[in-house]
Amino acid sequence: MPEDKWLNSKSLVPAYISPDSSVHGIVTAKGEIIKLDCVFPVLHGKNGEDGTVQGLLQLAQIPYVGCDATSSGVCMDKAVANAVADAFGINQAKWCAFTQYDFNKNRQECIDTAVNKLGFPIFVKPANAGSSVGITKAHDIPELIEAMNVAFNEDKKAVLEEFIDGHEVECAVLGNEEPIAAEVGEIKAAAEFYDFDAKYNNPASELCIPADIDLEKRNEVKAQAVKAYKALGCEGMSRVDFFVRNSDGSVLLNEINTIPGQTPISMYPKLFEAAGVPYKELIDRLIGCALSRGGKF
């Protein structure tokens, strides 16, 4: 798969996952049926971790690793996820959201609402996007307008959040009815914040395990991670991200990633490795969570 050469491989065969539960697998262009015991989605962003693929697998009654279609969709939409978290009393940064239609129609009203509620700087994010794509930090109104346009290039809805001066930490969670939290790690971004470029292209960004916060605060993050995981209906796995504010130590939910990276150097497996669960065992457990649900959701 290096350099995407697999896309042009002569061995590639067109195929699709049949929604017919009696097929329970993949159908090739030649009509060959390949039965599937379990699917491990390794997809990020739209049409990968937003419930679309998960819904197809549920329709086909094929077990798969990770959250179901509903939870995947809720967690993917940052505005919906924030609203659910608010309803469950989970602390998070102050936020608001606007659709592209409303922002274009009532721009000044939307700007006034955001500035009065959040102050500057303001983080602007597409409501539905993966890998930190389209995130901008705005320091004034002209930058805010530009940031909204950047977000609307990725999605028709944008989420705006107050800036939190603090630690950006992550907690890996595993399980279905009785989820467990692993160790807590911290991102020390080389750039001003952990955007797409800092995440994938800047080797100076650091992942610290455990996070540079005291044990009591790490335990609080773990407890809040499990609470958020359950509140948003997660199963199988998720990485739950938080801010720990410097001024008062408050733990604030940032977002839930329902398909965290699974390479040996990704934060999710490294957090479980730090908690005593080696990579191969982690994969076995994730598949076990999927098989224990069967094809029923």
Give short role names for the model-derived ranges.
Residues 1-70, 74-76, 80, 99-110, ...:
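ATP-binding N-terminal substructure of ATP-dependent carboxylate-amine bond-forming enzymes
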Residues 29-33, 74-167:
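Active-site nucleotide/adenylate-binding loops and adjacent lid/helix of ATP-dependent enzymes
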Residues 55-64, 140-141, 145, 274-277:
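A glycine- and small-aliphatic-rich helix-loop capping segment at beta-alpha/alpha-beta transitions
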Residues 63-64, 92, 122, 279:
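Hydrophobic beta-strand scaffold residues
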Residues 89, 214-297:
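ATP-dependent carboxylate activation and anion-phosphoryl transfer catalytic cores
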Residues 136-223, 249-252:
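Phosphate-binding site of ATP-dependent enzymes
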